[in-house]
Amino acid sequence: MRALRALLSAAALGALSLNAAAAAPDLSGVWFISHQVGALKTVDGKTPPLTAAAHALYDAHKTAIAKGDYSFDGVTHCLPPGLPRLMLMREPFEILQRPKTLYFVHQINRLPRRVYLDEALPTDVDPHYLGYSVGKWDDDALVVDSNGFEDGTLLDNEGLPHSDALHLTERYQLSKDGMHLHLLMTIDDPKTFTQAWTAEADYTKRPGYEIPEDVCADTPVAKRPRN
């Protein structure tokens, strides 16, 4: 009898999970950022709260950019931009939505990002350019937690640094008409910032758009980021 109850309970939980997935908003489609983001700012338009050491590094990056020197930026060597920078670039991305997994496929080098739904975020993972991401539905919003980032990428196109302690939380909210997507991101990195902070971005859906092939190695000379 206990075994039967356990089986029925598991089946019920599975059905609830499937029903939740079925009721989740459909984020599928190709998305373009609505407004170009250069320097990432907090939601109130301020410079993020950098530590003294990180501020010095940020200033060094901005000085180099002013001189036309982008050699510090791995993107100029065809390395992946990292997050959340990849979400701030003008090139579009496509969301492929499945019951247990979401995929972000970016035009830039066709970079794929996998978000595992309803899984725990590992505390010890090998570093990746796009980190390791898990997600869950909070009512009609998709909440994504990511860690395990390479520390050689940047947070934006203006040289904002981060460390391997970066923890990124993203909250995606779809508009009622399904054509606009709002992203609220929280950046927590105690090695780089004195406190966690939030930023935001908006995206517009482009029905019928097919993302073209994009291979960085085909660029004759990559001396500076495309954005």
Task: Give the ranges of each region predicted by the language model.
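Bacterial N-terminal signal peptides
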Residues: 7-19
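Positively charged n-region of N-terminal signal peptides that target proteins for export
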Residues: 1-5
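Short helix-onset patch at the extreme N-terminus, typifying the N->h transition
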Residues: 6-8, 29-30
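Hydrophobic small-molecule pocket/channel-lining residues, especially in calycin-type beta-barrels
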Residues: 20-227
